[in-house]
Amino acid sequence: MKETIDFLIDTIEARQVLDSRGNPTVEAEVFLECGAIGRAIVPSGASTGAHEAHELRDGGTKYMGKGVLDAVNKIHETISPALCGLSALDQTIIDKLMIEIDGTPNKSNLGANSILAVSLANARAASKALDMPLYRYLGDPLSNLLPVPLMNVINGGAHAPNGLDCQEFMLVPHGVKTFSEALRMGTEIFHSLKSLLDKKGLSTAVGDEGGFAPELSSCEAAGDLLLEAIQKAGFIPGKQVSLALDVASTEFYRDGFYKYEGTNLTSSQMISYLSNLVSNYPIVSIEDGLGEDDWEGWAALNKEIGHKVQLVGDDLFVTNTERLRKGILEKSANSILIKVNQIGTLTETLEAMDLAKSAGFTSVISHRSGETEDTTIADLSVATRAGQIKTGSLSRSERIAKYNRLLRIEEELGNQARFAGDLGLGPKNI
């Protein structure tokens, strides 16, 4: 039996490492008195919302200004001295103390990247000290639900240098009984899609998240390709495998218009366009269908199609409880995307998920386009019984690492493991 002193933080180390785009990011290690060590690496986004917590970068010439040595120094010089001697089991106290020391609304003093690295590393250290898997430590004995994967197999927008304005076209394999079956289904469709692209003379180069980045002219062209790939792989669109979109509308919202596929659309016209897509394709989820501050448009979109599909706020909510409360009050959406680095601590992430659940919203755990080998979000999805996870395509090892972690968790849970399947999707199945 470990004594209380065994869980005390002895020291915290940090370093600059690289993410999947070759850009610097922060890695932190929390060392406990008992010898347990927790390590975490933070991700970084390409299409970042204006309301996200602040990511500290060095500027200057090294790494084109994207170095994070300042953030590393903040951990060594400010965060570590403040946290040493505290119990790693007191996650909320640790996170709130870092927020207090930072003293800014968006963590621009210490940097969300430095704070989050320590927050996640601390949770890992605590779980190791207790000899528990992270999903069990963060969750409870009933944390046995494996999420439906939303697999980004065609990349566009800020994630790929092609002509697609829509950022992500995702496969949603839900009509099976296990996560491993869903992963197999998605993988077979991914390879089917590659074969189709080859035959059509289209590029099979991949984007930031491992999806293909062919030169396509429209969202509909991508949707048609996915339906063809699903059927070619031997599966039934809409029954076994559905589609999801991340429109990332903020990226092309300018001067009151959505500059989409060569035309200027009003909010009302964009809503009509999305409604038509839902009518013509087996789409179960649309993320960021409108811009991050188009609150009136979001409410209209939710009224129009929120009873049919999951409407996910990413840039709209940025994993922030204040913006989520506004969205709940105004009935702006029915789901929230959860990105730990948007808010900057594990505690605030869990608070956002609790608030979403209390309002009947679904939560989708998500990676970022600049990822690492860190697999925390896989454990988080099971710990919180989120029911859905976005962690990229079926290529690039920083994406596969999360899928492989979920396979191990499913195996570890044995006959207690459940797969979210159809029940993991919203809004009708909330």
Swiss-Prot record:
Cofactor: Mg(2+)
InterPro entries per record: Enolase, Enolase-like_C_sf, Enolase-like_N, Enolase_C, Enolase_CS, Enolase_N
Record-annotated active site: 209 (proton donor), 339 (proton acceptor)
Pathway this chain belongs to: Carbohydrate degradation; glycolysis; pyruvate from D-glyceraldehyde 3-phosphate: step 4/5
Cofactor comment text: Binds a second Mg(2+) ion via substrate during catalysis.
Similarity comment: family membership: Belongs to the enolase family.
Residues at which Mg(2+) binds: 246, 287, 314
Known role: Catalyzes the reversible conversion of 2-phosphoglycerate (2-PG) into phosphoenolpyruvate (PEP). It is essential for the degradation of carbohydrates via glycolysis.
UniProt name for this protein: Enolase
Record key words, sorted: Cytoplasm, Glycolysis, Lyase, Magnesium, Metal-binding, Secreted
Entries under SMART domains matching the protein: Enolase_C (SM01192), Enolase_N (SM01193)
Binding site for (2R)-2-phosphoglycerate: 167, 339, 368-369, 390
A Pfam family recorded for this sequence: Enolase_N
Source taxon at top rank: Bacteria
Localization of this protein: Cytoplasm; Secreted; Cell surface
Record GO terms (molecular function): magnesium ion binding; phosphopyruvate hydratase activity
Enzyme Commission code(s) on record: 4.2.1.11
GO biological process, any: glycolytic process
GO cellular component, one term: extracellular region
Organism expressing this protein natively: Prochlorococcus marinus (strain MIT 9515)
Reactions catalysed: (2R)-2-phosphoglycerate = phosphoenolpyruvate + H2O
